[in-house]
Amino acid sequence: MVRRRGPTPPPSPPREERPIVPQPAIDLEEGEGQVQPPAPVRLEIIGVGEEEEIVELEELVQGGVDDEVAGGEEVEGGEEEAEAPILGPQERRVRGVAAGERGELADRLDPEVPGPQPGPLLRDASGWSDIDQLGAWQCALNPFTTMESVPGPLKSKWARVMEIVLRAILTAPDEIRLTRALKWFLILPQAFLRQSKRGGQVGRSSVAGRFNAAMDGDFGTVIRLLMADRQKDEETRRREAGRTRRQKSEEEIKEGQRKLALSHLQKGEISKAVSRLTSFGMASIDDPVVMAALKSKYVARGKELPESVIMGQAVDFLGGLKETFASLPTGVSPGTGGLRAEYLTCLAEVWEDGTMAILEEFSMLYISGNLPPWWYRVWGCVTTVPLYKTVEMATVRPVGIKNPLIRTLHSRVIRDNRAALTAVLEPQQLALSLAGGHKLVHQVRMMMEEHRDWVVVKLDVRNAHNEVWRSAIIKALEADPTTQHLAWFAAVILAACSGLETGGKMWGEQGDGETQGDPKAPAFFAMAIQAIVRILDAELRAGGGKARFGNDDGYCGGPPEVVFPALARFETKLREECGLVLQRDKTEVFAWGELPEITPPELKRAGVMVQGRTI
């Protein structure tokens, strides 16, 4: 802030704006791929008693010009006392736990999510507070398709807008302004980078116009344009609701798959191309049968979480996010809100290390559980996609998608703690082990070939990741001294029920379980069942056998008279302590000869018999 002091001037009007040179809409075809310098921020002269202040845009958005004028108090020397940020700096930066320190979960289980501000809006000059007309869920749920990447000429402006919002979060002096800034963070992708309904120059200019308004300090126009597009989108949906859509032919579906696969191949994304070609397609949530199947996959909370959890720091620091963002995979679904990985890569391209530190600080607040409880409920909302399991299209499996920033942060937590987690899980659980899949295959095969009189049972746990009790995850992390520092991170992320949405519409909640595709899910699931797996392994080893798991895929080998009783006890403990159900009708038994007489009748034989041999 720049101050101009001097003799007492005559009374002046409350505010006088300096003239602004209007910026023309940017033609995205010109300078494509180039990073343009950020547009100059708007300055305003504000009369405050005996002096005038030149206020930058960042200060204006901290709650509006009126707050800026009236919010400060004069202290000795005539300077205003800066209001302390409500979030404050992080107190602990080193992984570990503080002796005897526990965090309460009561206010995190069902936090009240901020809604639209009731009554007339208190508008400010920048329009920053216009977002008060929207609730947090309205900001998070995105009915639009966002652009695949940030257009070259707009990269610096996207980075600038993101920086303004993050600074507003970190410096917010009260709950009202913190909530306002967090809602801006939620709505940024759809507010600025939603695809225009019109193509060509008109469409490109409309996108550029949103950024130009923000660079002119006019965030109110950004909200106004968004609300107008939302209204048009709703009207279009209502008109099309009663229409019968033409069903695509099988050849049209295959042609679409080939085009998508080819686009991935052109980018060098071979695995994505293969998955497109082998996919059986996506089911429609408008089909009542599909929706019923989808809802059955997400369960209500089966066991209450503990009242308090050991406080700990999951990671030491988050330095290096810039390099991580620069190498994020492209073409990945953005999840709830429309924030694509390409938008984060843009930040890595534009921001200097000092600016990236702002996002690192925000991310540390998230991981440490220092953001408002409602934030974890809203930001952690899961986009659900029902995919057909087979070519018959008779059954579906749900795929849950979280936004790429959450996935990146959760991946960092697991990466930094992989050694500690692996030490707890091995040798029974190989999900996090180096070349764990190879180790699992070789150990099971060697066990089968070495002991021709044994049986090997392949376990099938129903809907494992979606049904495991969250309380079991937290309990397991707290139980081991080497993983206690992760318990608080798990608790704040999992305390509130997770929202489930598709196409910007909420359709349900998930009270227990993890999200498949979330980088923390395999590790947390493995920890939840590890104590029971150890008991199973110990019972089998008493008879010479062993138990080995690759996450929820388990294999038990040993003499039949040892394996089957141990399996029954494992099944009971799994249900009582983790809320998981062993599907006996899908659990298979391998034996070189005939199945032993003591084999439970509901367990089926693995493999097939050909000329007296099992293959």
How does the language model describe each region?
Residues 413-429, 523-566:
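Active-site palm subdomain of RNA-directed nucleic acid polymerases
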